[in-house]
Curated annotation (Swiss-Prot):
Chain ranges for the short sequence motif PPXY motif as given in the UniProt record: 154-157
A molecular function (GO) term: zinc ion binding
Protein name in UniProt: Gag polyprotein
Species of origin: Baboon endogenous virus (strain M7)
Residue ranges annotated as motif PTAP/PSAP motif: 173-176
Compositionally biased residues, Pro residues: 143-165, 188-204
Site positions for Cleavage: 145-146, 226-227, 477-478
């Protein structure tokens, strides 16, 4: 049995229900047709190393994301939802993606601030003059100082008192080293550091250590490494610029003309820019008319989720989830950000609901495949038409048969003939129909082949016309020659002229043809003579 090659694109298409659920968690929506089109046709043309079968390489995904989210005219706002969903599949891989991911070669570390232990006992100050037991230390040679290494210097701390030296045991014959310096700063809330087991100090110390005398045992090395602590993140805010609003309004159709395109644009803006409540109002004010804005707000208030996740009908919950006046949400807190997320989600649902037009199947039937349009692009336009002019989802299983019949009937003639000859059309899925149509589309002649064929057909038509004209001229010439020949033969068959006294029969002179003795004569019967008393019959 043969083996099937699994690619990132085919893997995501097989588990597309999980992909759609992942996108829903990111507050965006993705469609299977566009997912396949962007991966196999659009992103390879960005020249960042994206293969036609997709990839799980995070560096390539981030390069595509940079190109797609370009704020200039070369950006692709309609593709943002798809590339960030792809990125999330790699950053938080589901079980069916993990076997295909590359293991990172290096690990990243986070540098955090050190915290001084809280319960720190201050060492007593060292005596100014040594006692009698330590006088012998004055006559010994001092130990050499270690080489200065700036990497081993501790970070600066704001300590209320200068550092002090730890006491040295009288029995220790060595002088204190620079590593025995201890900071005396004591922050109010920090646990005491654990003590290390007795051991010899390392050759190259990386931690701040000090030597302390135990009560009943030898000296121990205690660590002064402070516990790590995290720092609160601060949310940065960038309002919309006037140029952004102008470009969005100028380079995109109006909501009444193409609601799907403008909805995709606003969806990408909500995802990438993370706008506040005021920014959302500014966006609606610029991109929508008054009537369109009222319809969007009305539909959005119908889709405010309740405690169970379903749309609620309670006015107080609707006003709380989708307020019409400026709320007092604190975006630095988790509840404030959650309220803003629910507001954006309801606003996006309102845009999609207001973009649906009255049911008009006649509009759907007018969507036909173009002369040079690919089957995948035609299928995408057809699905958009169903979403725009019908109330049902064309990708739902119960409506796929209707979409399939429309795709076959409204396709190009050569593709339509091929699809109509398939066995069991009702059992074929939409993707299977597109693949069969692609086979016919890819076998079409190129423009060069078409031009050569037209030239050849023109030459053949001219040859047939010349042959027909030559044949007609041949018939005319043949008729003329035949007539001339007939005229000449008629002249030769005329009787020769005779003189006035010459017989035309025997050519002798002295009599005419009627009196020619050599001419045979017919025996005439004598006319009957009637007698008296007989009647003629």
């Amino acid at each position: 049995m043969g083996q099937t090659l699994t690619t990132p694109l085919s893997l995501t298409l097989t588990h597309f229900s999980d992909v759609r659920a992942r996108a829903h968690n990111l507050s965006v929506g993705v469609r299977k047709g566009r997912w396949q089109t962007f991966c196999s046709s659009e992103w390879p043309t960005l020249h960042v190393g994206w293969p036609r079968d997709g990839t799980f390489d995070l560096s390539v995904i981030l390069q595509v994301k940079t190109k797609v989210m370009d704020p200039g005219p070369h950006g692709h706002p309609d593709q943002v939802a798809y590339i960030i969903t792809w990125e999330d599949l790699v950053r938080n891989p589901p079980p069916w993606v993990k076997p295909f991911l590359h293991t990172p070669s290096t690990s990243k570390s986070t540098l955090l601030a050190l915290e001084v232990p809280k319960n720190r006992t201050l060492d007593p100050p060292k005596p100014v003059l040594p006692d009698e037991s330590q006088q012998d230390l004055l006559f010994q040679d001092p130990l050499p100082h270690p080489p200065h290494n700036p990497l081993l210097e501790p970070p600066p701390y704001n300590s209320p008192s200068p550092p002090v030296l730890s006491p040295v045991s009288p029995t220790t014959p060595s002088a204190p080293t620079p590593s025995s310096l201890v900071s005396s700063s004591t922050p109010p809330s920090s646990p005491a550091p654990p003590e290390l087991t007795p051991r010899t100090p390392p050759q190259t110390p990386r931690l701040r250590l000090r030597r302390a005398e135990g009560q009943d045992g030898p000296s121990t090395w205690q660590s002064s490494l402070f516990p790590l602590r995290t720092v609160n993140r601060t949310i940065q805010y960038w309002p919309f610029s006037a140029s952004d609003l102008y470009n969005w309004k100028t380079h995109n159709p109006s909501f009444s003309q193409d609601p799907q395109a403008l909805t995709s644009l606003i969806e990408s803006i909500l995802l990438t820019h993370q706008p506040t409540w005021d920014d959302c109002q500014q966006l609606l004010q610029v991109l929508l008319t008054t009537e369109e804005r009222q319809r969007v707000l009305l539909e959005a208030r119908k889709n405010v989720p309740g405690p169970g996740g379903l749309p609620t009908q309670l006015p107080n919950e609707i006003d709380e989830g989708f307020p019409l006046t400026r709320p007092d949400w604190d975006y630095e807190t988790a509840p404030g950000r959650e309220s803003l997320r629910i507001y954006r989600q309801a606003l996006l649902a309102g845009l999609k609901g207001a973009g649906k037009r009255p049911t008009n199947l006649a509009k759907v039937r007018t969507i036909t495949q173009g002369k040079d349009e690919s089957p995948a692009a035609f299928m995408e336009r057809l699905l958009e038409g169903f979403r725009m002019y019908t109330p049902f989802d064309p990708e739902a299983p119960e409506h796929k048969a209707t979409v399939a019949m429309s795709f076959i009937d409204q396709a190009a003639l050569d593709i339509k003939g091929k699809l109509q000859r398939l066995d069991g059309i009702q059992t074929h899925g939409l993707q299977e129909l597109v693949r069969e149509a692609e086979k016919v589309y890819n076998k079409r002649e190129t423009p060069e082949e078409r031009e050569a064929r037209l030239i050849k057909e023109q030459e053949e038509r001219e040859d047939r016309r010349d042959r027909k004209r030559d044949k007609h001229l041949t018939k005319i010439l043949a008729a003329v020659v035949t007539e001339k020949r007939a005229g000449k033969s008629g002249e030769t068959r005329r009787r020769p002229k005779v003189d006035k006294d010459q017989c035309a029969y025997c050519k002798e002179r002295g009599h005419w043809i009627k009196d020619c003795p050599k001419r045979p004569r017919d025996q005439k019967k004598p006319a009957p003579v009637l007698t008296l008393g007989e009647d003629s019959e």
